[in-house]
Amino acid sequence: MELNQVDIHYLIAAICVISSALIFYKIGVWGERLQRKLKFWHLIFFLLGLLADTVGTSLMEHIAELTHLHDEMHTVTGAIAILLMFVHALWAIWTYVKGTPIEKRHFNRFSIVVWCIWLIPYLIGVYLGMRLHV
């Protein structure tokens, strides 16, 4: 199915916002990994990534409704990723506020796993987007 001008604008906005989520989340996760301790600014980037991913996903959902282009695997993995990002953000806040120094040092293990899982729907979306234009 071909995208019209409105769909293209939604798609461009969604791609920008989802890519912002990738950048925010990557900075938070890898910043935490490199510094070997959970810090306040990592929480900010986790939350910015979650916010951008949620907004981008809602834009993508709107595009899917307009175009009737749905991919079940992308939908399921995307929902799992957002849920994990939400749990990750809550757990990060709890660990930052009440966690022991050891918990703050080891939190990055969970962050890396969540980030890797988040990449799955991101890459599926990239593949689906490229497939649309072939």
Where are these regions (language model features)?
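Juxtamembrane boundary at the C-terminal end of a transmembrane helix
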Residues: N4-Q5, L123-V134
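Short, hydrophobic transmembrane alpha-helix segments
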Residues: N4-V6, W30-K37
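Hydrophobic transmembrane alpha-helical segments in integral membrane proteins
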Residues: M1-L22
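Hydrophobic residues within membrane-embedded alpha-helical segments of Major Facilitator Superfamily
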Residues: C16-V17, F24, F45, A52, ...
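Interfacial loop-to-transmembrane junctions
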Residues: P101-C116
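Loop-to-helix transition at the N-terminal end of transmembrane alpha-helices
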Residues: L34-D53
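Short alpha-helical packing/oligomerization segments
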Residues: A64-W91
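Membrane-helix exit/interface motif
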Residues: I27-G31, A52-L66, W91-K98
